[in-house]
């Protein structure tokens, strides 16, 4: 890649994004449901491990179609990560850390952060968006774009 990894990530974090999530849409701020209690439930074991495996399924299958260029906690970057290492890094990042995955030669980005119950996909092409939607659905997850409505 012509520019460095961190610069590419920084630019992509400003791009339109979609959420890969266990929920089918954004929960409104004024929802009468128990989003935070449910989110905490999914952050506990064994639910968290199951959720991590669903996300790993998406990334590993995506790696069959596209190169993944991965950085963990802002450290070194790896192209063609071993599937077991990618699983380990993602699981660790979702517990306590941060993972950045560049896709399509740095045109798109997936991030995972500790304490989150979702992945975030930035700047996908229409083809990548459709592929990730299919992979997420197959893994029992949803792909949605956040609302610009301030009530959400």
Question: Could you say what each language-model-derived stretch is?
Answer:
Residues 1-118, 123-152:
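Structured alpha/beta or helical-core interaction and ligand-binding surfaces enriched in interleaved
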